[in-house]
């Protein structure tokens, strides 16, 4: 590792192992998991070096538990593009509740703009992480479009077509929920945007899915800027 100066005031987490195990001939993650009655995922979380090196070495020491662990349940979401490096994604997945994959756009006639998401979905399930579909106003050229978003918000028939296609794809690919990420929404579309979210939520909830929506951070209702004004 390259030596890097730590910034003053940075907090460091120091965990002290309370239970260690030395790998013996024939051991696997599954057998060690059974021996200590802990999930394999916990072994990966306690030993990040195992995530990209799944083969155990005889004599290798692994951490079973740490001293004075403060455990509580939290929900963690991570975003990833389909072209993310596999080794980076694998290091993150053991710590994620949801993996939101960026992202589907839609055409003016309601067809979804496809992405290569299936490898990430399979990997998410491998680590018991729930994959979340993302819908945005990204067009065929890869840019966010306020005009494309407005077209959707103001056209109920288009909303129905887009949602029909989304639900069919979610069932097919194994998504558990939908994340809506619309940037550069114009102020004139603020009310219609909320109406779209209400309609989307009702369609999703009726079929057992959830809805997340991404909002720009606002410090006041009067905050100016195209990223903020339409977000209530």
Question: Can you annotate each of these PLM segments?
Answer:
Residues 68-82, 93, 107-232:
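Chitinase-like catalytic core of GlcNAc-active glycosidases
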